[in-house]
Amino acid sequence: MFKQFAQHLPEGWDEFAGFFAALGDPTRHKILLIFEPEEEICVNEIAAVFDISRPAISHHLKVLRNANVLTCEKRGKEVYYKVNYDYCAKVLTLTQHF
């Protein structure tokens, strides 16, 4: 048992905490699961799949983007999102060592 973590989180954990917090919502799980590997999807396409408002989808995308789970690129008037597989793999690999 790592009793020291009951008092203090490991160095660098703050970055990981945001990652795991972003994954703490079922809607965000569903958003991530609609992506095929290396696929880029625009906000309108994502919103069309769900029965919630576009502003709500945008909020969830922002949370995932701020946690580096998704990356985005603006093209004209559209914003395209893509799963940041490299970062997700890095976080999961590093947390195995705690």
Language-model segments: what does each one mean?
Residues L32, N66-A67:
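Extended rod-forming repeat segments used as scaffolds/tethers
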Residues F98:
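An amphipathic, aromatic/His-enriched active-site/gating alpha helix that lines ligand/cofactor pockets
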Residues A48, H59, R65-N66:
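Alpha-helical residues within the helix-turn-helix
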Residues L33, H59-H60:
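Base-recognition residues in the alpha-helical recognition helix of bacterial helix-turn-helix
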Residues D14-S53, R75, V79-Y87:
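N-terminal helix-turn-helix DNA-binding core of bacterial DNA-binding proteins
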Residues M1-L23, A67, V83, A89-T95:
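N-terminal leader segment of winged-helix/HTH proteins
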